[in-house]
Amino acid sequence: METVYFNGKFITKEEVKISPDDRGFLFADGVYEVVRWYQGFFYDLNGHMTRLKRSLRELRINWTDTDSFPDFAEKLIKINSLENQTAMVYLQVTRGAARRSHNFPKPDVLPTVYAYAWGFLPEVKLKETGIKAMLKEDIRWSRCDIKSVALLPNTLSFQEAHENGLKECIFVRNGLITEGSHSNIFFVINGTLYTHPESNYVLSGITRKNILRIAEDCGIKIREEAVEENRLRFVQEAFISNTSAEVMPVTELGGNTIGDGVPGPVTRIISDKFDNEINSLKG
Ligand code: PMP
C-alpha cells in the first residue's frame, strides 16, 4: 500500500482529499520539487531546499513548515520500504483552497502540501547510446526560473517529442537555446562547455549547478552563455541534465546529428565524475 504525505499526515493515497476550490486545481497556483534518493541519502537536498524556498517566495506562498520537508521526505522513503532503492520524492505546495478569485485569499488560508515517493530503475542503456531530441519555439511564460506546477507548455511540447519517438523537446527563444521541457541542456564547442546562464528563461537546475562545479574541478572551460540555434552545426557534443537522468547525452537534435552521433569525451568525463561523486557519497 502506498503511503503519502498530506498536510502533516502520513496516509494512503486513497485517503487524500483535495478541495475543488484548491488554487492548485483552479489556477496551477503552486510550486513543486523533486529530490532523488540514492539508496541511503538525498543528493544535494540543500540545493533543492534553497530553490523550493525561492519558488515559494516568488509566488508569495507562505508555507511556514518548509524546513520539515527533509524529515518527511525521508520518512516517506522508509514507510514505503524504498531505503535500498533508487527513488524519488515529489513535493507539491499550493496556495490552498478558497472560493475562486484572481486575488489571493483574504484572510490567508493554509497551503496544501502533498508528497509521495516512488522507486525507479535508472536509464543506464540510454546513457550509453544517447537520446534524440526535437527543437521547438519556447512557448512558455517569462518566469521559467520558478518551479511552478503550471507546466502545460512543457507537457504539450514533451508530448510532441514523445509522439515523434524523441526523448526531449529543447526550447529556442529568439534564436537562443534555453533548456528542455524538463531538463537543462549543455553543449561542447571546441572543448568549452556552454549552457544558458541562470535567468528568468530557464529553471536553475540542481543537476546543472553540480555539473558546472564538477566540470570546473576537472579544468573544463565553462561559458554560461546561450548557444544560438544557428551555431548548432559547430557543436561537437550535447547533453541534458536533470535529477532523474543526471547526465544524458544528446546525439541528435532537431534532426541533425551532434558530433559523431555518439556520446562525446567531455560528456563522458562529466558523467563519470558525477557517478564517482554519488559513489563516494554512498561511502
Ligand atoms: N528545467 C526544467 C524546465 C525542468 O523541469 C527541470 C527538472 N525539474 C530541470 C530544468 C532540471 O532541474 P533539476 O536538475 O533540478 O532536476
Task: Indicate where each model-derived feature is located.
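Feature captures the catalytic cores and cofactor-binding loops of soluble hydro-lyases/lyases
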Residues: 205-210
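Glycine- and Gly-Pro-enriched alpha-helical subdomains that act as flexible
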Residues: 176-198, 204
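Conserved alpha/beta cores of soluble small-molecule-handling proteins
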Residues: 1-169, 173-176, 199, 212-283
